[in-house]
Amino acid sequence: MKITCTDLVYVFILLFLNTSCVQAVFSDDAFITDWQLANLGPWEKVIPDSRDRNRVLILSNPTETSCLVSSFNVSSGQILFRNVLPFTIDEIQLDSNDHNAMVCVNSSSNHWQKYDLHDWFLLEEGVDNAPSTTILPQSSYLNDQVSIKNNELHILDEQSKLAEWKLELPQGFNKVEYFHREDPLALVLNVNDTQYMGFSANGTELIPVWQRDEWLTNVVDYAVLDVFDSRDVELNKDMKAELDSNSLWNAYWLRLTTNWNRLINLLKENQFSPGRVFTKLLALDAKDTTVSDLKFGFAKILIVLTHDGFIGGLDMVNKGQLIWKLDLEIDQGVKMFWTDKNHDELVVFSHDGHYLTIEVTKDQPIIKSRSPLSERKTVDSVIRLNEHDHQYLIKFEDKDHLLFKLNPGKNTDVPIVANNHSSSHIFVTEHDTNGIYGYIIENDTVKQTWKKAVNSKEKMVAYSKRETTNLNTLGITLGDKSVLYKYLYPNLAAYLIANEEHHTITFNLIDTITGEILITQEHKDSPDFRFPMDIVFGEYWVVYSYFSSEPVPEQKLVVVELYESLTPDERLSNSSDNFSYDPLTGHINKPQFQTKQFIFPEIIKTMSISKTTDDITTKAIVMELENGQITYIPKLLLNARGKPAEEMAKDKKKEFMATPYTPVIPINDNFIITHFRNLLPGSDSQLISIPTNLESTSIICDLGLDVFCTRITPSGQFDLMSPTFEKGKLLITIFVLLVITYFIRPSVSNKKLKSQWLIK
């Protein structure tokens, strides 16, 4: 077809309309989708700062092995800084020679540290021979300054001892935590043990200024509750009503009348103005993301269980806002599980041998039942055996086990020992620092089948079972179109053993059914056991981290990839080759593997694997660093088959997502998901990943002393447009294009007719 000048003009007009009417702006979500709840823990001691009356030093022991020291502004309720000490403080006193210096002592180890009271700089430390100190007073104020009478708190005048300020005590008042009357006056009350309220003077009145609740410290378990759009529920009801109709005509008439009523309601809401209706349909408020949060699965409630026996719901799209909180009145929380598919009920196990069933509602959950286990022992751990049969394996601190079955029906929340023995076998693997143990549950009895114990000079430092994922591909397609088949045997676990005598780290891959070790790999580069070690097990690969001293001190990352065979197109698990997986009879092929070691510039504390709905998105290794930051690395960078760029063959470069081997992996600033936040994860923190309705997006949360959540997109946000995308201009552009097409269509038809008759 011949192109004329007129056609070119039309093309330029279309391009102009496209560029002028459509503007897609993609903005950074930093500090918009992520949030942090910083905690101090229950206040053990409050120490005034002599150089600033508005500042105090707060000591708390959130864990059994560490102490948290925080500088706090009592006038504004703002946290100024926090510092975790690697030991608990038994004594804290002022230096006799310098009252601006604080001496912290651990009596069991005689370890002491001397800090500047104002900015908490470490001045001196040692073992034994601590500096001479002055004992701190038990209270932060004099007893004759405050009195409590008839449910009122009176602040007394220093000379007349008459009440200068009066305050009605809040419900649940426990004690006066801190008080000073110098300008400005500051008063802190402790309420319900975990709540702290700050007051200041406004004339003759005491007014509340700030409030904190420290119940969230030390999260031990979590559950996620999806929030659904009420309109989806209404739509489901309409569809069910249509399906229940007697005939096709009745179903059609029901849909027609329902949609007509919706149209009338829409017109009423907009005062029967077509212009308002059209504007509402085109408008898209970039700040209002309620609908998109519901649609894309961002709207979730994070339910957390704390060590001190509190359970609470946090709104994940509203910066972790507390929706509800419930005191379970137990000594310690251990584990909790959903008891039904609809997520209407939770069961919580406590450390003292009780279990509670909790009905979860939107407003305030209620405790339905509270019962002791059949064996009144201290609970160490709880494992869910079967999601549908509500069976749990409870391990006590004396190593005994209890098989527990819960009937989630109404008024029957009691433990039941099944009378009908199941013919199926359930295999369970447990581990501790002394070894790994295999059990079989048969006929409602628990029997140990195998045991892998370590010797006295060894310790198991990390353990991970193979992650259950959606299987998308059986193998890796190479550059020459051949396939390396993944080793997808599900009953696998990987663990690390530290040998203090020989200064080695040993990686083992074990079959959890038989206890057979399939792969072992030893590292003799002088691992430093003072630093943390961790391991994660993905679909067909394992990644573990440790710190070594040779040849130079550095953090190591090791990846191990498992294949059925390292020979392309060789698949040993094909049923046509008369091969079957049966580990109990010894019919199992050991995996062949490739491994690579990388250097990482920061010390890694814990690791986790990103999860998405269908597991299509590239997996990311999410890492919590020792410095309090959280970052992630796409798994494709940790390639065990990678070679240096100069050694890569031509076919290897054609492989999808192939990356050359680089021994040092730098930290990408764009992948630091905590940004400049001061995050205190704690010694037993959990790094978790929660899938959303968007395949590209995963929610990452760190649960410990603090709670932090954000979203990551390891493969980019390929399935979501920005809220600022200008939908109205796009529709106008399409409309203008249709109009132009309508008017130029006769001209094009006329040209075609003339060309057939050879008319110029």
Swiss-Prot record:
N-glycosylated. Residues 25-723 are lumenal. This is ER membrane protein complex subunit 1. It comes from Saccharomyces cerevisiae (strain ATCC 204508 / S288c) (Baker's yeast). Belongs to the EMC1 family. GO terms for cellular component: EMC complex; endoplasmic reticulum. The gene is EMC1. Residues 745-760 are cytoplasmic. The chain crosses the membrane at residues 724-744.
